[in-house]
Amino acid sequence: MAIREILTVPDPRLKQVSKPVEGGVTDDIRALMDDMLETMYDAPGIGLAAIQIGVPLRVIVMDLAREGEEPAPRYFVNPEILETIEEKKPYEEGCLSVPDIFDQVERSARCRIRYLDYDGKQVDEWAEDLYAVCIQHEMDHLEGTLFIDYLSRLKRDRAIDKVKKAKIRAIREDAN
């Protein structure tokens, strides 16, 4: 397993649409998911899409366990949202690709999803609350959409500028 670099805005690769995984869940895909999970835990975060580490495949990892609980990793290959309920709720979201930025985004409180798990088994289930929000957020990444794309242009531009400035500060600090 290896910790990979997480892409941050305004990296254009984050706007790519990810391709389906062909040939099922192979050892290479499992190795990718293992790296993604280690990267996500190191960040730390609760979800990560493969495109966030520069791999344009429809793969997501997630762990919604609270601090102090046993890890509960989940793996999603070629996930699809089959159905959502009409009721939407605002949730405060953040993103490892938009570090230190948080804002309200409206999402369906419940959605039905289908995906292949770590072992290649097809799963069809309903996701609710934080699970529903997180899967929708991560699946947006697979379509090249970031949570800040739901914000006003002003808020989005400010978020990108803040991330750019933080990168410049970090580079300067590393140089000293």
Curated annotation (Swiss-Prot):
This is Peptide deformylase. Belongs to the polypeptide deformylase family. SUPFAM superfamilies: Peptide deformylase. It comes from Hyphomonas neptunium (strain ATCC 15444). One of its GO terms (molecular function) is peptide deformylase activity. Its cofactor is Fe(2+). It is an enzyme of class 3 (hydrolase). The active site is at 138. InterPro entries: Peptide_deformylase, Peptide_deformylase_sf. Binds 1 Fe(2+) ion. Removes the formyl group from the N-terminal Met of newly synthesized proteins. Requires at least a dipeptide for an efficient rate of reaction. N-terminal L-methionine is a prerequisite for activity but the enzyme has broad specificity at other positions. Transmembrane segments: none annotated. Its EC number is 3.5.1.88. CDD domains: Pep_deformylase.
